[in-house]
Regions:
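Eukaryotic intrinsically disordered, low-complexity regulatory linkers and tails enriched in Ser/Thr/Pro
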Residues: 1-13, 17-64
């Protein structure tokens, strides 16, 4: 799960495994595998960084 900021400035928590694609048009649009779309303030690169950080965190054995 990653925490992002919706365009309404409220926190949105998204399951990163369910992300199908990320587009910038000019705001960032995240499309999930089920077709739901989320507009967020973070850039695509920031979203990717959050996904990588989350995956590193869940693969770190000290959290198990």
């Amino acid at each position: 799960l990653i925490k992002l900021t919706g365009l309404n400035h409220k926190e949105v928590i998204i399951n990163s495994i369910a992300i199908e694609k990320i587009e910038e048009v000019p705001e960032t649009v995240i499309t999930l595998l089920n077709g739901n779309k989320y507009l967020v303030e973070e850039s695509p690169d920031e979203v990717i960084d959050k996904i990588i950080a989350f995956k590193k965190r869940i693969n770190d054995t000290k959290y198990l």
